[in-house]
């Protein structure tokens, strides 16, 4: 996949109507946005366009309204908050059919530097099916397209891919540019040693990632629930820990592949365990084995030290997925240890979105990382070596 895409700085935007696909898929509680990370992420692109005299038409999805106009998925609160953040009115076009009379009127009346936000694109069924009609309607509003929603770059939808058939030029905003730079460099030309850390519950979610990264990394660290499938493959006892029985053979293949490629594959050498899936006091095991009746819920202190050492020696580190049950205070230690080691490392440190990003932000290490990806699913597919349709659809430099 070509990562060298045209950006908003490569096109003339003054006086032009510019459709921008943002990622405003933010959590709401009682109509108030509870996490503004994605709004903050979109600001540099929106401000650049406003400051350079573009007429800015924003669009995004939120949640899964499944093709129906459900008020709880309305982008009205986003328009309100964006107005406050920009210090100027963001006109909200509240059309249930997204590109309706309100949108057309608002867009027709725009002056340079004005901003309009369209209603949730997933109010229309065809959005997720990449239907021609909505793609054409969105394209008809503007003279060029900017994609700045990395979080949906792995989806071929109307507002990410379909619209580019009818609207050129199609370029990326600052957010996607930054994602492509950090993730692209890490995967294509990393500074070595290159260490990848994978956690989370299931091996099945990360099969292609493990396979692809074993071709590229010097060290692969595995924690979280998926470690138990690997330990079982090595013949250790795992008690009542989460194991994907149908993936034990696959784990054996990956262990063999790591050896063949000369990749260090690090697995837990001790665990924090409990008798039930609850936030109870942790029992620390002596070694890799977990006794009958106990389940592994986090990596142990010896493992933390080994993982931290590997991170300390690295020049590029990429992390996706927690080391244990991060929501339980007794079992968040491994995740904290990895986050801390990355924060202190003299390396390019990349967090692959999702749970790891949330953990790093909660722990206050966010500003110590080189890059926190805004797309969990998209960054995983990127690490699998897949082409992301939303990126592929943009014009090359």
Swiss-Prot record:
It is found in: Cytoplasm. It catalyses: (2R)-3-phosphoglycerate + ATP = (2R)-3-phospho-glyceroyl phosphate + ADP. The lineage of its organism: Bacteria, Bacillati, Bacillota, Clostridia, Eubacteriales. This is Phosphoglycerate kinase. Pathway: Carbohydrate degradation; glycolysis; pyruvate from D-glyceraldehyde 3-phosphate: step 2/5. Substrate binds at residues 23-25, 38, 61-64, 122, 155. The gene is pgk. Its EC number is 2.7.2.3. InterPro entries: Phosphoglycerate_kinase, Phosphoglycerate_kinase_CS, Phosphoglycerate_kinase_N, Phosphoglycerate_kinase_sf. Monomer. It comes from the Bacteria. Keywords: ATP-binding, Cytoplasm, Glycolysis, Kinase, Nucleotide-binding, Transferase.
